[in-house]
Curated annotation (Swiss-Prot):
One of its GO terms (molecular function) is asparaginyl-tRNA synthase (glutamine-hydrolyzing) activity. It holds the Pfam family GatB_Yqey. GO terms for biological process: glutaminyl-tRNAGln biosynthesis via transamidation; translation. Belongs to the GatB/GatE family. GatB subfamily. This is Aspartyl/glutamyl-tRNA(Asn/Gln) amidotransferase subunit B. Heterotrimer of A, B and C subunits. InterPro entries: Asn/Gln-tRNA_amidoTrfase_suB/E, Asn/Gln-tRNA_Trfase_suB/E_cat, Asn/Gln_amidotransferase, Asn/Gln_tRNA_amidoTrase-B-like, GatB, GatB_C_1, GatB_Yqey_C_2, Gln-tRNA_amidoTrfase_suB_CS. Disulfide bonds: none annotated. The keyword Nucleotide-binding applies.
């Protein structure tokens, strides 16, 4: 029997507002534990929540960027549950009237485009954070009340690879809107996955399991891959899939049972009595719509049509707003588009991945990389020298021309000087001359290598090849 995988993702995104969703407490990451808290966050008797209008605007902006319909009337609800990181014993959320509905994003997997539906986007407040120690737990309520949006996909995802692509695209869109930093390491983007299997051709969904503790996109992919195998094995052996919550253990690469899954009835939702419904007229919607900046798909199309970049290059450059903004700054400085793209996708990305950094954490500037690309384009430096210059400028922030002067890295293009290098290489390697005359093509490559060694990598390789062939013909 063959099974079809059905996956839906629930993504929580913290909005980077100055204050919290329903109180005036600061909503900043990294403060000392329990310092960004007030009586509203703690649910003291007699205090009342007040809706943060900026958070509502930003929730609408995110929903619009995800091609969603904005409700004219929306309300808040109480989600009742007890947990140590929830001092009020309820969370203010949205149940049956979310602010955004019926959206979608397009993803690319294996060169094909697929549309993934988005059921809803709703606003809510975040809970606090528990840190578990040996025999006790610490509670930090700084995060309590931070504005969140939860984005729930349709069960349109069929593979772990599609789930990964969906998360990448969703993160990029939210990042471009400017409403969140979407940093998983800081908790401003979190993901739960619902996954089930059903026989190929069957319309009815199978029983789903929810996966938690997915702390990176790669863990989402690995957790789903394991869960597909686990559920398939259970079903093939005649077993039954239970509706349960499981967590991904990154050390074993397996999912582990946490608890039997609750349904929405367990939370006893009811309308929030301390907040009136929100009425969102067309004028409000248009003000928010006008605030949406250029999104990744628009930039991608521009990079292909205006700058002549391949689809793949345009896709990679627009995956993060930071990289895309950097590229645009280089173009504004008249750097060659393709060379700039090659360096950002190659040398820059390699450096960032190796050092686990983001662009803003380096000393690299668009001005310096543009200068280096121009020097490379006009033949002032070779690719080999460019790599040396880049290694220095990304660490120090020095201008490429300054680095070249300090290290004597200017490419040598003077014909007489190059001819002297060629002559020295030929005099030192008579056997290579014989090999060339006997039709051995590798001899030329060897001699070019010797010339580059003599010139300490500074010889212009194009001119070297030309002069070398001329001199070989004379011998």
């Amino acid at each position: 029997m063959h099974f079809e995988t059905v996956i839906g993702l629930e993504v929580h995104v913290e909005l980077k507002t100055e204050s919290k969703m329903f109180s005036a407490s600061p909503a900043h990451f990294g403060a000392e534990p329990n310092t960004n808290v007030n009586v509203v966050d703690l649910g003291y008797p007699g205090v009342l929540p007040v809706v943060n209008k900026t958070a509502v605007d930003w929730a609408m902006r995110a929903a619009m960027a995800l091609n969603m319909d904005i409700r004219t009337e929306t309300k808040f609800d109480r989600k009742n549950y007890f947990y140590p990181d929830n001092p009020k014993a309820y969370q203010i959320s949205q149940f049956d009237e979310p602010i955004g509905e019926n959206g979608y994003i397009d993803i690319e997997v294996n060169g094909e485009t697929k549309r993934i539906g988005i059921t809803r986007l709703h606003m809510e407040e975040d809970a606090g954070k528990l840190t578990h120690k040996d025999g006790y737990s610490l509670v930090d309520l700084n995060r309590q009340g931070t504005p969140l949006v939860e984005i729930v996909s349709e069960p349109d995802i069929r593979t772990p690879e599609e789930a990964y692509a969906y998360l990448e695209k969703l993160k990029a869109i939210i990042q471009y809107t400017g409403v969140s930093d979407v940093r998983m390491e800081e908790g401003s983007l979190r993901c739960d996955a619902n996954i089930s299997l059903r026989p190929v051709g069957q319309e009815k969904f199978g029983t789903k399991a929810e996966l938690k503790n997915l702390n990176s996109f790669s863990f989402v992919k690995k957790g789903l891959e394991h869960e597909v195998k686990r559920q398939e094995e259970v079903l093939l052996n005649g077993g039954e899939i239970l509706q349960e919550t499981r967590r991904f253990d990154e050390s074993t690469g397996k999912t582990i049972l946490m608890r039997v899954k609750e349904g929405s009835d367990d939370y006893r939702y009811f309308p929030e009595p301390d907040l009136v419904p929100l009425y969102i007229d067309e004028a409000w919607k248009e003000r928010v719509r006008a605030s949406i900046p250029e999104l990744p798909d628009v930039r991608k199309a521009k990079y292909v049509s205006e700058y002549g970049l391949p689809e793949y290059d345009a896709h990679v450059l627009t995956l993060t707003k930071e990289m895309s903004d950097f590229f645009e700054a280089m173009i504004a400085l008249d750097a060659d588009a393709k060379l700039s793209s090659n360096w950002l996708m190659g040398g820059v990305n390699e450096y960032l991945n190796k050092n686990q950094k983001e662009l803003h954490e380096t000393a690299l500037t668009p001005e310096n990389l543009s200068e280096m690309v121009k020097l490379l384009a006009d033949g002032t430096i070779s690719s080999k020298i460019a790599k040396k210059v880049f290694a220095d400028t990304v660490e120090t922030g020095k201008a490429p021309k300054v680095i070249m002067e300090e290290q004597g890295l200017v490419q040598i293009s003077d014909p007489e000087q190059l001819k002297a290098f060629v002559t020295e290489a030929l005099d030192n390697n008579p056997q290579s001359i014989e090999d060339f005359k006997n039709g051995k093509g590798k001899a030329t490559g060897f001699l070019v290598g010797q010339i580059m060694k003599i010139s300490k990598g500074q010889a212009n390789p194009q001119l070297v090849n030309k002069i070398l062939r001329e001199e070989l013909e004379k011998r």
